[in-house]
Amino acid sequence: PAWLVDCPCVGDDVNFILTRGQK
């Protein structure tokens, strides 16, 4: 999503959330 590019500083948090959502 575009907001991910806007907040690269929270990339780790987003990645963690996405991982939880996918599993």
From Swiss-Prot:
One of its GO terms (molecular function) is toxin activity. Residues 1, 9-23 form a propeptide. Keywords: Thioether bond, Toxin. There is a cross-link at residues 3-7 (2'-cysteinyl-6'-hydroxytryptophan sulfoxide (Trp-Cys)). Coiled coil: none annotated. It comes from the Eukaryota. The keyword Methyltransferase does not apply. Major toxin that belongs to the bicyclic heptapeptides called phallotoxins. Although structurally related to amatoxins, phallotoxins have a different mode of action, which is the stabilization of F-actin. Phallotoxins are poisonous when administered parenterally, but not orally because of poor absorption. Belongs to the MSDIN fungal toxin family. This is Phallacidin proprotein.
